[in-house]
């Protein structure tokens, strides 16, 4: 099974990275930038291809990927034409605008390699079988979407559905169809079609790749764009991204909001795109006069296009990710871009310092006001009303909620002291450095949203956190993601200060020793040059290799952060917060006797599969059987709860099937649908909220009901053959 998991990981990585990378490179974007933004662009290309081929009547993976390839060819063609029209020098200045020396591919690969290994250990520890699934109503819906795409070849997010096009019309109980952000579902469905693996496994692989690769690489790239381009920061990133319980562990444990998880994981990469785009809009003071003149009038159109596609990709993953992205980039605009723009305009038009300050103040107020205006407008639009008016009834007093932010216990109220210490060191460091200052504002904004999401004042709750369903789990995840870069800076700053102090002490001792002795040929060879290259003694070799030693310390610190034991309680072995997160993740994925879809039910279903083959099986979705199509390919009738637009035969079957022996109307419905069997599992733990005995009164069948024959039974589980219509 784990070999199949590895195969699926490779396929999903190819789907997430190759199309986007080729498209970005076709536009002339640098290799490393193309690699970072590839998942966003790939999702956008797959999404638009799915929409484009639908009205053409094209179905399946081949037309979908063919459309993606066509978009790449169009991009390459346009880039070639532009290159021919413009002078070579102008093209070169546009190509490099905002990208020069911004990202280091080696450090990104280091982060990706270590983070993948770390999260695989976490994943394997919690989810011991990659075909286990999170047992929740939302996840059953996600799996139904994926299965429908696999069976129908339809990938349009404008026509998302549980059944339509997947089966014959008379075997399609519900016809509801509409918009749904299906990026995760499309990637999983394509991976299922290519590999032949089940939808449950490929769904797990998509969110695994998002968390293990896309998220850490995005954070590492973000740190590089603001100047933290070194091995220590890259190594720390691999550990710190998993050190906060609120994200990713809690987000993949509760609600089954996997599309939201995928979107949040891609936000750092989208922020990187935005920063690179704006970096080209205003020249750096450190650039030469010629470079400033070249870039003063232009914004890299390639990065603008990619940024727009990145924003659309976030919406295709989950629209709430776009609002989180906006929360992250607004502080960058206010704290970094606008001051640089003001300085540039001040120099260009020789404005006085007073006028420059006034200009900055006006631009800051206008930008902030515009942002608030857009926020209020969207908050009151009709298409977002179901989201922003949804209320999670979880309430915590503001001071108590703020305290959980300070100690990073967040919603679970389990303080993570080591993470908190690193963060607050980083917070001070960011305040003192103007290049990092915006990170603190982004964190504070997410913290306010989180505290507001726990408020018992509904207008406040709705205004601040409505775009995230007022869900404190999601807002806590945003706090964690916003805190990660700051915590990494705090750790890197601490390690650097310690090693700088050691380096200073060694140099001081050596210098004093050399002054008090005659210099021999051996001692003279031990002098310390500015870069340490001439050092040969042990202390000086320490200085020479302090970068490697710092990385080793970073690994040790990262291991401490992710320790399964609460270090404060040693020698007693108490679980750490991360260990609890792994335990909780296991509890919602592993089928047990207390879960909706039990281990014993799974054994019964495997036996039933040998009997039913491809025949249509009527089932009660409230007993957990609605996932069997995705898990084993069983041709079940109901893989979703009751929807609005329903097949007339479905209404008859779910309300009157137990009358099949004597009711001609029911017999006709059974014949028309082709139903042959009825599968009944345990209803003690209903999969979906609701009165199953009301909606599925026709499936209240016992061994004494005429018209059915028991073909398999174990305890309360039954597989009946419908004999009344034979």
Regions from the PLM with identified roles:
Residues 1-101, 526:
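Membrane-embedded, hydrophobic transmembrane alpha-helices
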Residues 11, 17, 512-515, 555-726:
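Extracytoplasmic
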Residues 45-49, 117-127, 152, 234-253, ...:
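Membrane-interface helix-loop junctions at the exits of transmembrane helices
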Residues 288-293, 325-366:
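Perimembrane helix-loop-helix junctions
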């Amino acid at each position: 099974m784990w070999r199949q998991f590895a195969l699926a990981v490779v396929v999903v990585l190819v789907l997430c990275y190759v199309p986007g990378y080729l498209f970005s490179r076709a536009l002339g974007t640098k290799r490393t930038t193309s690699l970072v933004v590839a998942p966003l662009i790939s999702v956008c290309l797959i999404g638009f291809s799915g929409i484009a081929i639908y009205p053409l009547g094209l179905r399946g993976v081949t037309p979908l990927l063919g459309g993606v390839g066509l978009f790449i060819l169009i991009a390459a063609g346009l880039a070639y034409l532009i290159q021919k029209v413009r002078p070579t020098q102008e093209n070169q200045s546009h190509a490099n605008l905002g990208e020069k020396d911004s990202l280091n591919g080696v450090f990104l690969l280091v982060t990706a390699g270590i983070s993948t290994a770390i999260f695989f250990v976490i994943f394997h520890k919690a989810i011991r079988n990659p075909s286990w699934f999170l047992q929740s109503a939302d996840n059953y819906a996600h799996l139904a979407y994926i299965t429908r795409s696999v069976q129908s070849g339809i990938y349009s997010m404008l026509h998302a559905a549980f059944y339509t096009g997947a089966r014959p019309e008379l075997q399609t109980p519900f016809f509801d169809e509409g918009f749904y952000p299906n990026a995760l579902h499309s990637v999983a469905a394509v991976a299922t079609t290519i590999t032949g693996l089940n939808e449950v496994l490929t769904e797990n692989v998509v969110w695994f790749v998002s968390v293990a690769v896309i998220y850490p690489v995005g954070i590492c790239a973000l740190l590089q764009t603001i100047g933290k381009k070194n091995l220590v920061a890259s190594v720390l990133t691999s550990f710190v991204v998993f050190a906060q319980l609120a994200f990713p562990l809690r987000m993949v444990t509760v609600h089954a909001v996997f599309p939201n998880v995928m979107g949040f994981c891609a936000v750092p990469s989208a922020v990187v795109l935005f920063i690179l785009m704006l970096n080209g809009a205003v020249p750096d003071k450190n650039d030469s006069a010629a470079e400033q003149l070249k870039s003063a009038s232009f914004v890299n159109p390639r990065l603008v296009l990619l940024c727009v596609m990145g924003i659309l990709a976030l919406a295709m993953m989950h629209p709430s990710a776009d609002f989180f992205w906006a929360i992250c980039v607004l502080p960058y605009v206010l704290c970094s871009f606008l001051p640089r723009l003001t300085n540039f305009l001040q120099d260009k038009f020789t404005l006085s310092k007073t006028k420059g300050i006034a200009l900055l103040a006006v631009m800051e107020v206008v930008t902030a006001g515009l942002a608030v205006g857009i926020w209020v407008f969207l908050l009151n639009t009709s298409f977002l009303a179901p989201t922003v008016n949804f209320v999670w009834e979880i309430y915590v007093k503001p001071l108590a909620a703020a305290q959980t932010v300070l100690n990073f216990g967040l919603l679970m109220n389990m303080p993570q002291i080591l993470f908190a210490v690193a963060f607050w060191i980083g917070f001070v460091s960011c305040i003192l450095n103007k290049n990092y200052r915006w990170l603190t504002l982004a964190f504070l904004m997410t913290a306010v949203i989180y505290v507001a999401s726990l408020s018992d004042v509904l207008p406040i709750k709705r205004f601040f956190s409505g775009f995230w369903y007022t869900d404190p789990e999601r807002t806590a995840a945003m706090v964690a993601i916003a805190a990660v870069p700051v915590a990494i800076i705090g750790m890197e700053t601490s390690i650097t200060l310690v090693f700088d102090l050691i380096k200073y002490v060694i140099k001081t001792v050596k210098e004093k020793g050399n002054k008090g002795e005659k210099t021999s040929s051996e001692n003279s060879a031990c002098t310390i040059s500015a870069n340490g290259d001439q050092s040969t003694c042990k202390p000086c070799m320490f200085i020479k290799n302090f970068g490697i030693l710092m990385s080793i310390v970073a690994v040790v610190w990262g291991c401490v952060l992710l320790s399964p034991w609460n270090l404060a309680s040693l020698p007693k072995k108490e679980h750490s917060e991360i260990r609890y997160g792994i335990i909780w993740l296991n509890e919602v994925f592993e089928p047990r006797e207390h879960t909706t879809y039990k281990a014993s039910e799974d054994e019964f279903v495997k036996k039933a599969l040998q009997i039913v083959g491809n025949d249509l099986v009527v089932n009660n979705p409230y007993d957990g059987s609605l996932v069997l199509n995705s898990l084993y390919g069983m041709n079940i009738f109901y893989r979703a709860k009751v929807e609005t637009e329903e097949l007339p035969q479905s209404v008859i079957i779910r309300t009157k099937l137990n009358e099949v022996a004597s009711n001609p109307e029911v017999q006709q419905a059974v014949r028309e649908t082709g139903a042959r069997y009825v599968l009944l599992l345990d209803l003690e733990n209903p999969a979906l909220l609701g009165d199953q005995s009301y909606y599925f009164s026709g499936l209240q069948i016992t061994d004494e009901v005429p018209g059915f024959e028991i073909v398999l039974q174990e305890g309360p589980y039954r597989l009946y053959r419908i004999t009344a219509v034979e």
